[in-house]
């Protein structure tokens, strides 16, 4: 596909990567391949897992699903953001300190491996107010969830994942009535991508859809 775009440029990501240049330096084909793979993985497998968590949350909070179903286009962005905040599929991420660091009276020497918990950070009441409540109408201020990480290792597929979740929620909510859990969900390991192995649900199809 990279070779194809070199001969026939399009208005797409691969063409933009081919044309990208900084101080005369361009990406190699190997680097482009890694970047495209990272975007696809970040926007497909992980999004499927996050969507499953979202459906589970809405099944457990039917009043929120009803709110979304009434105004799907208007509420989809807030719904996706609240799902990402409340139940991230990457609850634990590893980081390495690049220099000695002192934080809240704890000393971390350079090259210390730190396991950061986005799940806990995303429910910090100092940042999100009533953080333990799953509420798509809540004003969370300017705080952004740490679900996608931060800094140099911020998730490359973040924007794609958000767009896919918003589209899915806007499409499903007005079509799936009476959404509820039909059994106990079975979770995958919390390490890496924390998805759902099984998610029993029941719903009825909206008559006008």
Report each predicted region and the residues it spans.
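Cytochrome P450
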Residues: 1-209
